[in-house]
Regions:
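Flexible interhelical linker loops that connect adjacent transmembrane helices
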Residues: 1-3, 130, 178-208, 247-262, ...
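12-transmembrane solute porter fold
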Residues: 8-24, 29-33, 42-54, 66, ...
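Membrane-embedded alpha-helical segments in integral membrane proteins
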Residues: 26, 30-34, 87-92, 144-159, ...
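Hydrophobic/small/kink-forming positions within alpha-helical transmembrane segments
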Residues: 56-60, 90, 144-148, 152, ...
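Helix-loop-helix hairpins in multi-pass membrane proteins, especially solute transporters
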Residues: 62, 66-199, 410
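Membrane-interface helix caps and helix-loop-helix hairpins in membrane proteins
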Residues: 98, 189-194, 218-224, 351
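C-terminal membrane-cytosol helix-exit motif in multi-pass small-molecule transporters
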Residues: 171-190, 205-217, 233-248, 445-453
Length: 462
């Protein structure tokens, strides 16, 4: 690929490498959940917080990225985020209780949340338009596909060593990338003295935390007003106040003008709902395979690995397909493949063979790979002039919805299984009903695509 801005390309490559490592940490803990339950004497609903809190903090960190990228140099942001991630990984490695593990996961997510959107912004600022699809496909691989490889890597490490080595592995690789960043990441975008609206930052934290805590607590507290209903209400009310404030003040934390573009909204909703399902699957499938079907952590990870590989392949080619035949037919095929995959998951039982579990996850992997990157690229391309704010809105929405997805999935499975996901028919039925929920969501995506998604030429002529 011929590209004049070599410094920008090198910086982007380092950002992609850093994002890949940090995003793997998002889901690499899912095969460790049974071990956290044993070592720290906690429930499955509590253990999944190691996954959900990561997504929650990502959602919290993304809104201020529009401000951060306008205010600070890219190299400063990159180095700071990597140092935060390394410290978090070391805390997890040394954790002596579950609370310490959660603190480490929060710091890992803080580093990832600062880092993740910068690459997307760089693509639209330094790349020619004809390269947007390719590089956004690569970033889509990081946002939605790399986390799918986490369970496989985590399962292998656990079987060979123990769950703590996962965090040692992450820290060592990140140190190498930190050295490369210090030596080679020299490209900078123009910065400005953009003020931080602190009240907006606080509001964004409150609404993310409120929604996440409310949904996550359902498994342990039912529909308790204090533990569930109240946090959700606070989250929703705070979100409303946040939106009103952004539309009123002169220097908003996130400029919500991008939401006036209906096509950006459609694409963001599609990507968020698809990500909801992907995050839910990253939790529900390992729980079923290990606790219900009695496979090992490595086997659990290997069942998801081919799906991750096929998602990588289709994630790269799907933006190219969308450029050639239009985004609408690509997203329709994506939804149909996901419906077939989830329908197959409804047939799982305690004696399902390794080959059948693997093959059906492969079908679903094709559907997810076809959908995520084209939806994100399409949404961002229609508001390219406001890419910093569009990135913040798109990523925040996707991460918060993804965090809710992982929590709601476990909650539904656990409630339907009477609080104990184990080797019995009730747990099989709970998995089937959760898969049915995924089918319903996918049908909604199909309807959105048919009714509202348009190819770019049609938008211009609209």
């Amino acid at each position: 690929m011929e590209f004049e801005n070599k410094s920008g390309l090198i910086t982007l490559i380092i950002l992609i490498m850093a994002s890949a490592v940090t995003l793997i940490s998002q889901s690499i803990v899912t095969t460790s959940l049974p071990y956290y339950m044993d070592d720290f004497a906690i429930s499955s609903a509590t253990a999944q917080w190691t996954y959900s809190v990561f997504l929650l903090v990502l959602g919290v960190m993304i809104p201020p990225t529009a401000y951060i990228t306008k205010r600070f140099k890219i190299k400063t942001i990159l180095i700071t985020s990597l140092i935060l991630f390394i410290i978090g990984s070391l805390i997890c490695f040394l954790s002596t209780n579950f609370e310490m593990l959660i603190v480490g996961r929060i710091m890992e997510a803080m580093g990832t949340g600062i880092l993740m959107p910068i690459g997307q912004i760089l693509i639209f600022r330094i790349m020619p338009e004809e390269k947007w699809g390719f590089f956004m496909g690569l970033m889509g691989f990081l946002v939605g596909i790399v986390p799918a490889m986490g369970p496989t890597i985590g399962g292998i490490i656990i079987d060979l060593f123990n769950w703590r080595v996962i965090f040692e592995f992450l820290a060592i690789i990140t140190v190498v990338i930190l050295v490369l960043s210090i030596l080679l990441a020299n490209f900078e975008l123009e910065t400005q003295n953009y003020p931080l609206d602190f009240p907006s930052l606080i509001l964004s934290i409150i609404f993310c935390v409120g929604l996440m805590i409310g949904f996550s607590n359902i498994a342990e507290f039912g529909f308790s007003f204090i533990h569930v209903i109240l946090p959700i209400i606070i989250g929703i009310l705070t979100l409303i106040i946040f939106v009103k404030r952004q539309n009123k003040i002169e220097n908003p934390l996130v400029n919500l003008i991008v939401l006036k573009n209906k096509y950006f909204v459609y694409g963001t909703v599609f990507a968020a709902l698809l990500y909801f399902m992907m995050c839910g699957i990253n939790v529900m499938v390992p729980l079923f395979v290990q606790n219900v079907a009695y496979y090992s952590p490595t086997e659990s990870g290997l069942i998801l690995f081919p799906a991750a590989i096929i998602m990588i392949v289709f994630n790269f080619i799907s933006p190219i397909m969308a450029d050639k035949i239009g985004v609408k037919p690509v997203l329709i095929v994506s939804s149909i493949m996901n419906i077939i995959g989830f329908a197959c998951m409804m047939t799982y039982n305690m004696n399902s063979t390794f080959e059948y579990l693997l093959a059906t996850q492969l079908i679903r992997g094709i559907g997810c790979g076809l959908g995520l990157s084209p939806a994100i690229t399409w949404a961002m391309s229609v508001v390219a002039d406001d890419v910093e704010d569009a990135t913040a809105v798109n990523n925040t929405t996707r991460q918060v919805v993804g965090a809710i997805g992982s929590s709601v999935t476990v909650v539904i499975m656990q409630i339907l299984a009477n609080g104990n996901i184990t080797h019995n028919q009730l747990s099989v039925n709970s998995f089937s009903m959760t898969s049915l929920m995924m089918i319903i969501i996918t049908v909604v995506l199909l309807i959105i695509t048919i009714l509202f998604i348009k190819n770019k030429n049609d938008i211009v002529d609209d």
